[in-house]
């Protein structure tokens, strides 16, 4: 039987999230049945190679040169299927990569697929950004012969025709422990990506939020009033004084295996991103996790004028005057993600609290660190989710059933 040949395109500059989901899928494909390659920006190639996959970086800043290089690669690699790690990210890359979804569709007689992390059709491609700005994205997934939805972010259930739903493996799964593994100071894991520092709608309110949330998370952790170790991986370290009982360890980046080991060894993972790939890794690895989001408009300036603003909030984030709903810090996506997260067993496998609701946040952090009953309940939900994930077909079988290669 000849190998099926898949060429993945992960062309984002601001995050490894899209590429990590595609790489997770690709690593599940048996090498005696599938040949796999990844087209990436030059800076992303080492990340892909560290996962054990072949990378073909586009080295030029000139889109014409990159298109020529891709033409040569297609001729040499002879793919049966081109797979966008994210169709929208691929289109954004056109200015430097020379590639777009419509170009791939028109230029090559090769089946075309894309991952759909967020179920864009269910949201009718309408994306709401922090502060209320809404954009209808182009229906790029309609160009595809196949859509691939990663679970558990997408519900672990079979997809409609033209859609496959496959489970993420990440670094593997472990049961969530009912009690903490160690008796010394707990380790809290935090991570950020470069896109979290991009004000995508040039909104003053988003700028305020970008400055406020790291300080607010630090303030919540300090208010636990106990020794903690905070491991923070991301492009920028905290730029404010750290509370004396917090041992703050910062790294700009870690290799994928070390990143997963640090995450899996943590006692608590905290994120402001409901669709964080690291949150999926944490849930599968049995790491107690907390999502900090916001579901209501908070006029902090008005509360301050009335003397009713929480003292801790004005101390932690004095420049914050107003806060809007968000599920993904700092971009918003509150309404956009409602369909994919509704009736989804994944969201029951971690705790959520409104980031501005002090008592709820501190209670959730304390329960995740110390409360065996809460941890046992999460462990049961995680086990049930894993059972449903394992009932999904393996990636290779799902691709075979789609019967797309060599169309």
List the predicted regions and their residue ranges.
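Nucleotide-activated donor-dependent transferases that construct or modify glycoconjugates
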Residues: 2-14, 189-197
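Active-site and donor-binding regions of nucleotide-sugar-utilizing enzymes
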Residues: 7-28, 37-158
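Donor nucleotide-activated moiety binding/catalytic core segment of transferases
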Residues: 66-69, 234-285, 289-290, 294-295
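Conserved catalytic-core segment of nucleotide-activated headgroup transferases in glycan assembly
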Residues: 18-21, 25, 172-239
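A nucleotide-sugar donor-handling region in carbohydrate enzymes
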Residues: 124, 132-196
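C-terminal alpha-helical cap of glycosyltransferases
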Residues: 357-373, 388-407
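Catalytic binding pocket for nucleotide-activated donors in carbohydrate/polymer assembly enzymes
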Residues: 277-376
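Catalytic donor nucleotide-activated moiety binding site of glycosyltransferases and closely related
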Residues: 39-54, 116, 127-130, 212-256
